[in-house]
From Swiss-Prot:
The active site is at C86 (nucleophile), H195, E197. The gene is purQ. NCBIfam families: FGAM_synth_I, PRK03619.1. Residues 2-224 form the Glutamine amidotransferase type-1 domain. Part of the phosphoribosylformylglycinamidine synthase complex involved in the purines biosynthetic pathway. Catalyzes the ATP-dependent conversion of formylglycinamide ribonucleotide (FGAR) and glutamine to yield formylglycinamidine ribonucleotide (FGAM) and glutamate. The FGAM synthase complex is composed of three subunits. PurQ produces an ammonia molecule by converting glutamine to glutamate. PurL transfers the ammonia molecule to FGAR to form FGAM in an ATP-dependent manner. This is Phosphoribosylformylglycinamidine synthase subunit PurQ. It comes from the Bacteria.
């Protein structure tokens, strides 16, 4: 299984994703600049955190129009795993690959800390190594992480089991229904504000994010 880590101008978590997958998990990974237009030969695509295009207009709004996005859309349509963390989540909503939107934190401040999450759905490509209802801790670092959707869309997300992670002890940004991460209806596209790639080694003080990447790899092995 080969992973593409997309590099947008302003990405700053691309190296973290690469290291989590390649160094820690031993996966086959390559960087792909957003100016490229093809993802041929890749089996999964990862959209990193950061500040693509300086978050001008809106977080993720300009990145949505880069050359690589049509190929990412095709990967999603083909049922291949597509993952976005933080700014990657914002880009996925801007591209219409995930419902809802991410708006400014209720505090109007940048929030950087570790938060407790609840695994709301472990029946996905990304969460099979977790237990439903399990509490985990992951870092967050964002100013525009408050998930919003209109009431009808929000109800549909809930009814379909698309909520994968929820904030548990506290809601750090005002996200509706304490939502921290969601999938598309098909379940092969995941966006989340927390950073699992920053919690994959004991040296970092936490390994709760490691099982997300192992879940993807295990899914590939099962399919093979």
């Amino acid at each position: 299984m080969k992973f593409a880590v997309i590099q947008f101008p302003g990405s700053n978590c691309d190296i973290d994703l690469y290291e989590a997958l390649h160094t820690v998990c031993g996966a086959d990974v390559a960087y792909v600049p957003s100016k490229e237009s093809s993802l041929d030969g890749f089996d999964a695509v990862m959209l990193p955190g950061g500040f693509s295009y300086g978050d001008y207009l809106r977080a993720g709004a300009i990145a949505r129009f880069t050359n690589i996005m049509p190929a990412i859309v095709e990967m999603a349509k083909a049922g291949k795993p597509v993952f976005g963390t933080c700014n990657g989540f914002q880009i996925l909503t801007e591209a219409g690959l995930l419902p809802g939107a991410l708006k400014r934190n209720d505090s109007l401040k940048f929030v950087c800390k570790t938060v407790e999450l609840e695994v709301a759905n472990n029946d996905t490509i990304f969460t099979s190594e977790y237990q439903k209802g399990e509490k985990i801790n992951l870092p967050i670092a964002h100013a525009d992480g408050s998930f919003y959707a209109d009431p009808e869309t929000l109800q549909k997300i809930e009814d379909n089991g698309q909520v994968v992670f929820r904030y548990s002890k506290e809601n750090p940004n005002g996200s509706l229904n304490n939502i921290a991460g969601i999938t598309n209806e098909r379940g092969n596209v995941l966006g989340m504000m927390p950073h699992p790639e920053r919690a994959v080694e004991a040296l970092l003080g936490n390994t709760d994010g490691l099982r997300l990447f192992k879940s993807i790899l295990n899914h590939a092995e099962v399919k093979a």
